[in-house]
Structures are given as C-alpha cells and as structure tokens.
Amino acid sequence: MHKPVDLTDTAAFETQLDRWRGRIGEAVAEAMAFGTTVPAPLQAGMSHAVLAGGKRYRGMLVLALGSDLGVPEEQLLSSAVAIETIHAASLVVDDLPCMDDARRRRSQPATHVAFGEATAILSSIALIARAMEVVARDRQLSPASRSSIVDTLSHAIGPQALCGGQYDDLYPPYYATEQDLIHRYQRKTSALFVAAFRCPALLAEVDPETLLRIARAGQRLGVAFQIFDDLLDLTGDAHAIGKDVGQDHGTVTLATLLGPARAAERAADELAAVQKELRETVGPGRALDLIRRMAARIAGTGKKSAGRDDLRPHAG
C-alpha cells in the first residue's frame, strides 16, 4: 500500500511531482510531433499552447488518483495527456479578444498574440482533436475503457460543461447570486477536474456510487480552484502568476460578491469536502497529498503577491 508522502519532506515530494510532470510533459511533446504532415505555423501554435510549462495539476491528479486506485501508470498516461491538452486548448479560446482578451498566458504571449487569431482558433480545435485521438489509439486500454474515457472527455468540454460554463461567464445574469456563480464554476472550471477524477476511477472499475462520489470531489475541487483564481485576479501580481490579472474587472465573481475573506473561507470549505470524499472512498494517498500541496502553493502565490492572509486554505 502506498505510504503518503511526508509533506515536511519537501525534497521527496518535489521529486515525485517532478517525475509526474516530466512524464506528462514528454508524452504531450510526443503527441505534438507531427513532422511535415501538419502546417508548420499550426503545429507551432499548438506546441506554444500546450508545451509552455504549466503546472500540469490536472494530469498529475490523474496519475496520483490512479496510483491510489491501483491502476498502472501506463494505462493512465493517455488520459493525463488528453486532459492537459484539452485544458491548453480551452485557455487558447479563453484568451481570445472576443472572450477575455488576455495578452499573456503561462509567462509568455497568449497564442493569439504570438500567432494571430485564426491560427490560435485552429490550434485550439486541433488540440482537442489530438486529445481524443491519443486516447482512442491507446492500446494499453481495452476498447470499452477507451470509449468510456472519450465519452468523459467529450462531456467535459461540451455544452453541458466547459463550453456552457464559458458562455455563462460571457453572458452572466444581471444580478448574479452566489448559487449562479457556483453553477458557472461547476461547469467551466470543474469540468476538467471531474474528468481528471473520473478517468482513473473508470479505469479502476469502481462501483457506481464510488464513481459518483469521486466525481463530486473533482467538482468541488474545481470550485475551490476557481475561487482561488478569482482571488488572484483581484489581488495578485501578473509576474508572480504568469498571466494577466484584472481580467475579471467589472465581472461579478465570488471574490467580489462575498469579499476576499469570505470567498477564501468558501474555498477552504470546498477543499475540506474534497478531502473528506477522497478519504472515505479512496483512503489516504497520493491524491490527497497532491491536493494539499496544490492548495498550499496557490495560497502562497496569493499571499506573496497580495501581502495578505485571506487566501490561506484552512481545510484539514
């Protein structure tokens, strides 16, 4: 049985994170190696979007949770690559002038700034197609597993989830309530966290009730991280975060609706619920270790850039 990483042993935990991040990064790079079969500017736009660093949290969650559930890493890798690739594609669209009109992403020019809007849009579409292809062609998985993973990913990016949430973000109700915002976060941000939790659970063939609870944990983790993102947009430093801040100016978020302190409390409550669900369904393990470290790092970024304590998640 896996022994949880001692969070006080920073070097050991960083080594584990670096290994996962490196494995995912290598596999993503391999997926982007088309040679001369793809127009060079399009391939460059795709690579710019998906290979420019990033924390790889969603992909690492696939590997961590899959490890806890006893799924071999080789069977998890295509899901991790696909989710990271879809996430990058969604950011390309999110940054477009007709959306958030962001100029920087992952400490470099946004894809539409570097390559133009047309190439950025085509890069996003191509990344999504490539993500599905990576899973559909994974011979480490059974045909049934490939089908269930593709179904999960298709739903995650579709009109009932990520795309619907992005629409809600662009055209919110005039008087948005807290529940309106939570619903938006569940669709837009939670979608890929749910997928990151569902994919390894599906591969582990957990029972339907456990699958539901694991997916619910992913949904709540997505809500927590969107709240942290709102707080960083409100109080953060662009250099420390690696992307534009102030993009939510004039938009109602939980950070502006509730205030930073109450929003941070809500995020902490969501994280506590995530940890409870995982302890009861999966048990102590690498996924919980990773989630705690993710929350601590995001909170640390917020405190460093804002010089305040109200971004600290106090979930146990």
Set out the residue ranges of the language-model regions.
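Polar low-complexity intrinsically disordered regions
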Residues: 1, 91, 273-276, 280, ...
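N-terminal amphipathic/basic leader segments beginning at the initiator methionine
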Residues: 1-32
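Short linear motifs in intrinsically disordered/low-complexity regions
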Residues: 3, 7-10, 137-139, 208, ...
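Mg2+-dependent prenyl diphosphate-binding active-site environment of isoprenoid biosynthetic enzymes
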Residues: 32, 36-281, 285-299
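C-terminal domain/tail detector
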Residues: 290, 294-307, 311-312, 316
